Regions:
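Hydrophobic alpha-helical transmembrane segments of multi-pass integral membrane proteins
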Residues: 1-5, 27-34, 56-73, 96, ...
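Pore domain of cation channels
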Residues: 145-201
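Structural signature of hydrophobic alpha-helical transmembrane segments
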Residues: 17-31
């Protein structure tokens, strides 16, 4: 989460419209609140529920922020803003936005699947994503459960292949989320690469 916030701050803020510190500042405050109310250190069920709500709010803000930054970059590409004139800054901004999107959606998948990590630890009945190790238990160690790295890998492969690879979405919400991510990634990569090639020539 901290890495995603940092990526936003590395973007060329003077070339993007809006208040550059607003969304990262809100996300940072929520991250501090989450660390202060770590559900692994509190015994009260009500406190764990509050911490879980903070996590949900933080991840939703990260995803919304990723989509807003993508929309701003696409708008700059269409209107021919200064950031899109030189291929170097354009490719750097595009790479940072693409990476931030993948991190945000990886966290969304991690939080979405089976109701989140705490519910997954209780052997959930309904899963949102089917991993290879779940479909073929003989390929996995006993008691295998997906961890954040598995969802981060899902986010990167979905943004790169624009389709499911080794993890299948099973529920409507999982399919909608992957559809949004792959569509945004396709638009971002297509426009950035096309503009960069045009700037080189």
């Amino acid at each position: 989460m901290g890495l995603n916030i940092g990526l936003r701050l590395w973007l060329p803020q003077d070339r993007f419209s809006g208040v550059p510190w607003l969304l990262p500042g809100i996300e940072l405050l929520l991250l501090v609140a989450l660390l202060a109310a770590d559900p692994g250190r509190v015994a009260s069920r009500a406190s764990r529920t509050r911490a879980h709500r903070v996590v949900i709010l933080l991840v939703v803000l990260l995803v919304v922020g990723a989509l807003l930054v993508t929309a701003l970059l696409i708008d700059n590409l269409i209107t021919g803003a200064k950031v899109t004139q030189a291929p170097g800054p354009l490719l750097a901004a595009g790479a940072l936005v693409w990476l931030g999107n993948n991190l945000a959606f990886g966290m969304l998948y991690w939080l979405m699947d089976s109701g989140g990590p705490m519910m997954r630890a209780r052997q959930p009945r309904q899963i949102d994503f089917a991993f290879t190790q779940q479909l073929s238990p003989e390929l996995a160690p006993p008691g295998w459960r997906p961890v954040f790295l598995d969802y981060l890998h899902l986010g990167f492969t979905n943004a790169t292949a624009f389709s499911p690879t080794d993890v299948m979405p099973l529920t409507h919400r999982a399919k909608y989320a992957m559809l949004v991510q792959s569509t945004v990634a396709l638009a971002l990569v297509g426009l950035v690469v096309a503009r960069a090639v045009n700037a080189f020539t």
